[in-house]
């Protein structure tokens, strides 16, 4: 089994990465492979709602970062963890630009696979950013993996998050819970839930 972790921080080895590595280390100890993709400081194209992904099977803007995620999902992932620093009470905008494209073009390949979000902040806004990231999972029938608390940790300068003992424990618990869910789903014999044909409601006729 394999879990993809996306580091949504421009600092490739900052606090968000440290939190994700704590999750990954726990997953590895549970015999689950992991891969971390960092967005770094790359400029990220946002979705322009052109609809071409529906025809191509991938976003028409095939930049290196999107391609890395696309390739990882196509090669097969069993779970997804998204990490972000908190900016003005929300996730990093570059990360959201990437996720909009990923979930619109590849969301069908992530259905019924466990997802989790991780946020790191200096002081406040973590729960709002956490909620924002979880919305990606809830539009794609993805079970959300929880921990002993909301998946957040605190730190300002790089490395400080390691001193947040509760935050790091929350990350380890998240890793164990993700592993537990993956293993249970792997042995499930009843397949996926029954789905209805999607119905859309527009509020203006």
Where are each of the predicted segments found?
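Generic secondary-structure signature for well-ordered alpha-helical cores
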Residues: 25-32, 103-107, 138-142, 176-188
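N-terminal beta1-alpha1 ligand-phosphate binding loop
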Residues: 2-30
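N-terminal beta-loop-helix "entrance" segment that forms/cooperates
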Residues: 39-58, 159-160
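Helix-loop-strand module that forms the ligand-binding subsite of alpha/beta enzymes
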Residues: 56, 60-149
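Glycine-rich phosphate/pyrophosphate-binding loop and the adjoining helix
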Residues: 143-205
